[in-house]
Amino acid sequence: MKKWLMVQGTTSDAGKSVLVAGLCRVLARRGIQVCPFKPQNMALNSAVTPDGGEIGRAQAVQAQACGIAPSVHMNPVLLKPNSDTGAQVILQGRALSNMEANAYHDYKKVAMDTVMDSFQRLQQEYEAIMIEGAGSPAEINLRENDIANMGFAEKADVPVIIVADIDRGGVFAHLYGTLALLSESEQARVKGFVINRFRGDIGLLQSGLDWLEQKTGKPVIGVLPYLHGFDLEAEDAIAAQQNLSADRQLRVAVPVFTRISNHTDFDPLRLNPNIDFRYVGQGESLSGADLIILPGSKSTRADLAYLRSQGWDKEILRHLRLGGKVMGICGGFQMLGEWVHDPLGIEGEAGSSEGLGLFAMQTELTAEKRLTNVQGHLTLDGQTVAAQGYEIHAGRSSWAADQKSPIILSDGSLDGLVSDCNQGFGTYLHGIFDRPETALRICQWAGAKEIEAYDHRAAQERAIDRIADAIEQHLNLTLLWPDL
């Protein structure tokens, strides 16, 4: 029996991505061929598929939960915001164009065809598809031409469950109100509710559950407990949980740009118990770090200007004068060069921006985006380790032949630079910290000589298994699939 199920939420960050990942693992454990699907995702955290396409990072993690490789059809529409009112539109893994919100609203009728094409392809290949909605289905202003929530569910004729986060408060108002704002046909599609992140005695919640079921005629499929210490890659929001301790072996600071991208790069550092890790926000200081890492950016020149507006450029130069280490990834790497040129206006107004000058490097932004998974070797301080990652960038950087590139890729090409003073390191590789030995080598280069390796992939697997175990224990899945 085919199993299609869509998880929608009362709000953003209600737990949709994690619940879908857990359901994928539950079904995969039973030998069911399952895959994830998200019709439309708006996020700056993305992943590269084996065939060189770009999808939301959450769907790549959900594919991992299924034990399969990610595909562009698992997230056929990806929106990557590049301003407050516009985004780059990516269809089935390939960049289409930049669109303002009004233009994209009109385009959604066309985008729905792409969404349905991908979904139908997956239906032919898999026994089960766990579908993730976006935000809330009850956003009145977004319901016209909706392709992300009930608009898709109606078109594809799939059942829906609605999840809400009780830890935020107001869970019954969220669930009852969301259902009430749906049309009759949409309400009929809802098979039940899931309450997420509950702390305390479940008996004290029972009267509320009974009221909700009586008022809506829908069952509460289950109540998932608050999982202390749980961490799985965030879809887009910066993780609120920092890893602060005065006795850690390495202190890492990452400035949060206005268009920061792929901040999941830092999860292997943020979750490493040996590292004092912090994100540095507006009005905060970078001081006190051993290693400052400039992250990726969807708008490199704009974020370079933002960096200067915060005074972080002066703090970085002072950090270097005092012997500290600085690293840049992708857009952050470009910022560490001498100039970033945008003659075609790829990221906005055409022009050039002066970089921080740590590397004798020029970057020109181009219309062609490089999307690829890579492997190779990294050499720092004379020690070589295996390295891997993925590239997602529109810029091309050039530097003099006598500059030192620390990464040799499997095709013989070079990536990144190390400064002559050995205090700066830049690379285009997202995910460079995912391999334990690579992260360890970089941390040792930054001064943490006694630090231990941290296996982030293994930690991810434990997190996926943990949410799957909670689903098995606390959700009545036979309400969804009697034959399971």
Swiss-Prot record:
Alphabetic keyword roster: Cobalamin biosynthesis, Glutamine amidotransferase
Enzyme active site: C330 (nucleophile), H430
SUPFAM superfamilies linked to this entry: Class I glutamine amidotransferase-like, P-loop containing nucleoside triphosphate hydrolases
Matches recorded under InterPro entries: Class_I_gatase-like (IPR029062), CobQ/CobB/MinD/ParA_Nub-bd_dom (IPR002586), CobQ_GATase1 (IPR033949), CobQ_N (IPR047045), CobQ_synth (IPR004459), GATase_3 (IPR011698), P-loop_NTPase (IPR027417)
Gene Ontology MF term list: ABC-type vitamin B12 transporter activity; catalytic activity
Ranges of residues in domain GATase cobBQ-type: 249-438
Pathway: Cofactor biosynthesis; adenosylcobalamin biosynthesis
Keyword Protein transport: no
Taxonomy, superkingdom: Bacteria
Pfam family, one: GATase_3
GO biological process terms on file: cobalamin biosynthetic process
Family per record: Belongs to the CobB/CobQ family. CobQ subfamily.
NCBIfam families noted in UniProt: cobQ (TIGR00313), PRK00784.1 (NF001989)
Purpose of the protein: Catalyzes amidations at positions B, D, E, and G on adenosylcobyrinic A,C-diamide. NH(2) groups are provided by glutamine, and one molecule of ATP is hydrogenolyzed for each amidation.
Name recorded for this polypeptide: Cobyric acid synthase
Organism field: Vibrio cholerae serotype O1 (strain ATCC 39541 / Classical Ogawa 395 / O395)
Gene coding for it: cobQ
